[in-house]
């Protein structure tokens, strides 16, 4: 949602909760790249005149169906699945690690505190992702 993965160079992203740096029409759900600067707040869709909004999933809204299906497929075909920094409480996204487990993947959870997922995963690592992930990468890439 915050665009950090894309700015880090990742090209193959499934943004289940959207992207704060994209805009869409409130009524038509169509992406809007640009609009006339009329000074109106919020800005209006150049196609239909309705208000524009960030292209994110707000509480109570459904996840984008195509993106969710792609994420489900990725989870079901993964060899290793990382669940990082999530409460593991909000479905349907919280189901993804369980799909990976059911398909035989190694599931690694990284979180400051245990979650409902913790007892089910292959590895539950409690701590800050900013500390644990660099340590994992260093360990994987260290010479034998």
For each feature predicted by the language model, list its residue ranges.
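Conserved catalytic alpha/beta core of Sir2/sirtuin-type deacylases, generalized to analogous enzyme cores
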Residues: 1-144
């Amino acid at each position: 949602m915050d665009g950090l993965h894309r700015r880090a160079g990742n090209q193959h992203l499934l943004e289940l909760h959207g992207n704060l740096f994209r805009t869409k029409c409130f009524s038509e759900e169509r992406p809007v790249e640009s609009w006339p600067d009329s000074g109106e707040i919020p800005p209006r869709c150049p196609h239909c005149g309705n208000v524009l909004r960030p292209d994110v999933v707000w509480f109570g809204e459904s996840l984008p169906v195509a993106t969710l299906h792609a994420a489900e497929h990725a989870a079901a075909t993964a060899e290793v699945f990382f669940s990082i920094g999530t409460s593991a409480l909000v479905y349907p996204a919280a189901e993804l690690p369980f799909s990976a487990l059911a398909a035989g993947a190694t599931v690694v959870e990284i979180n400051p505190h245990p979650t409902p997922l913790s007892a089910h995963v292959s590895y539950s690592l409690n701590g800050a992702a900013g500390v644990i992930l660099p340590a994992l990468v260093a360990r994987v890439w260290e010479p034998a």
